[in-house]
């Protein structure tokens, strides 16, 4: 599976975090 940055950003934003694609993984990181 490949990381969809848009979807990653949206799901992380609901947690108050910033979404980043690291390789094929979505990571939620603090701003």
UniProtKB/Swiss-Prot annotation:
This is Potassium channel toxin alpha-KTx 5.4. GO terms for cellular component: extracellular region. GO terms for molecular function: ion channel inhibitor activity; potassium channel regulator activity; toxin activity. InterPro entries: Scorpion_toxin-like_sf, Scorpion_toxinS_K_inh. Belongs to the short scorpion toxin superfamily. Potassium channel inhibitor family. Alpha-KTx 05 subfamily. PROSITE patterns: SCORP_SHORT_TOXIN. Keywords: Amidation, Calcium-activated potassium channel impairing toxin, Disulfide bond, Ion channel impairing toxin, Neurotoxin, Potassium channel impairing toxin, Secreted, Toxin. Expressed by the venom gland. It is found in: Secreted. Its main location: secreted. Negative results: does not show inhibition on KCa3.1/KCNN4 at concentrations up to 50 nM. Residues 6-9 are annotated as: [R/K]XCQ motif. Has the structural arrangement of an alpha-helix connected to a beta-sheet by disulfide bonds (CSalpha/beta). The modification Tyrosine amide is found at residue 31. Blocks small conductance calcium-activated potassium channels. Shows activity on KCa2.2/KCNN2 (IC(50)=0.0243 nM), KCa2.3/KCNN3 (IC(50)=1.7 nM), and KCa2.1/KCNN1 (IC(50)=42 nM). Induces cell death when tested on human T lymphoblastic leukemia Jurkat E6.1 and human breast cancer MDA-MB-231 cell lines which constituvely express KCa2.2/KCNN2, but not on human peripheral blood lymphocytes (which do not express KCa2.2/KCNN2). Pfam families: Toxin_2. Disulfide bonds join 3-21, 8-26, 12-28.
